[in-house]
């Protein structure tokens, strides 16, 4: 199958960029499964040796499906956009993945695939594919250190304040790796935005990853990054997190007090169980296989399912 994957961004991303990293993982997964892949993305994109790159200015990707069609190679089977399209290019089967939450008052774009069962349900759909990543990018470590980790944007909806408050109450060191620097003291250490090897090392060494989401997470990519590293998750029951974090690999609660009380439970969880769950459910190959099934449905029936 010849799949055209379209992104607004330059790939791979510099810094964190969760959706962009998922796109790269998908391209690599499709190529590894033997599919032909063409990438439409910003100039400077360098993703996979096995994929053809077509550089497109961002404004042309955003303008219209008619503009987009100009860049789709002859003979392509399907377009997979990672940004909203009001309609697909004429004569080209297409799907699109929604990486965020859609405004309720705005009509949902056609052929939309969501990131989790909860994400789909909240938008009146049942069509979803869980995100996946390449396990080779993460370091498995069975022996953990005595500090906790918060990884990602320091926005209130990500709940970093809960992790900070827990560190203050318990005295346990919390390392925060994120893109905006507030003022932290005491048992909280801020290390800035991290990626690549440095992020992998932090994830592998941490006692647990905090994911105390205060919003309905469409997915929550740091969660599976932690699991690949053998690191359990401490978080809330919001959005997709209950689909990812089972009792064998983490602790989910509704309040900060409950999370603090249950916090020591993460030390009893088996790092190998965390890694195995991620390898079963959340690799780039599993994600690619699940998308291919949807592509095949669209090509055969014109419908997502």
What do these predicted ranges mean?
Residues 244-257, 263-268:
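Conserved acidic donor-binding segment of nucleotide-sugar-dependent glycosyltransferases
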Residues 9-11, 28-62:
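N-terminal strand-loop element at the rim of the active site
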Residues 200, 223-228, 239-243:
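Short alpha-helical segment that forms part of, or immediately flanks, the ligand-binding pocket
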Residues 232-235:
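Short hydrophobic beta-strand element within catalytic cores of glycosyltransferases
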Residues 180, 188-205, 213-216:
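Conserved active-site histidine-acidic residue motif and adjacent donor-binding/catalytic loop
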Residues 126-175:
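Conserved donor-binding/catalytic core segment of Leloir-type glycosyltransferases
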Residues 267-305:
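A charged, aromatic-enriched C-terminal amphipathic alpha-helix characteristic of glycosyltransferases
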Residues 94-139:
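Donor nucleotide-sugar binding/catalytic pocket of nucleotide-sugar-dependent glycosyltransferases
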């Amino acid at each position: 199958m010849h799949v055209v994957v379209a992104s607004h961004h330059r790939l791979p991303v510099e810094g964190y960029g969760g959706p962009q990293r998922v796109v790269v993982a998908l391209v690599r997964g499709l190529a590894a499964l033997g599919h032909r892949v063409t990438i439409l993305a910003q100039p400077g994109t360098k993703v996979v040796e096995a994929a053809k790159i077509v550089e497109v200015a961002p404004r042309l990707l955003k303008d219209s499906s008619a503009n987009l069609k100009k860049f789709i190679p002859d003979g392509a089977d399907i377009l997979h956009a990672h940004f909203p399209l009001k309609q697909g290019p004429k004569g080209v089967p297409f799907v699109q993945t929604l990486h965020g939450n859609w405004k309720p008052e705005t009509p949902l774009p056609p052929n939309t695939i969501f990131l989790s069962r909860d994400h789909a349900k909240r938008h009146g759909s049942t069509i979803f594919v869980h995100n996946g990543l390449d396990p080779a990018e993460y370091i498995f470590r069975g022996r953990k250190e005595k500090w906790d980790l918060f990884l990602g944007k320091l926005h209130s909806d990500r709940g970093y304040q809960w992790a900070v408050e827990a560190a203050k109450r318990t005295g346990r060191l919390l390392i925060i790796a994120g893109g905006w620097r507030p003022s932290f003291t005491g048992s909280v250490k801020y290390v800035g935005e991290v990626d690549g090897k440095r992020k992998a090392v932090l994830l592998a060494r941490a006692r647990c990853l905090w994911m105390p989401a205060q919003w309905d997470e469409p997915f929550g990519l740091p969660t599976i990054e932690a699991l690949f590293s053998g690191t359990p998750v401490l978080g809330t029951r919001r959005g997709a997190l209950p689909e990812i974090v089972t009792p064998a690999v983490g602790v989910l609660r509704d309040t900060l007090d409950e999370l603090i009380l249950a916090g020591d439970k993460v030390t009893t969880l088996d790092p190998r169980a965390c890694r195995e769950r991620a390898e079963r459910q959340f690799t780039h190959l599993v994600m690619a296989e699940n998308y291919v099934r949807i592509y095949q449905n669209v090509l055969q029936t014109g419908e997502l399912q």
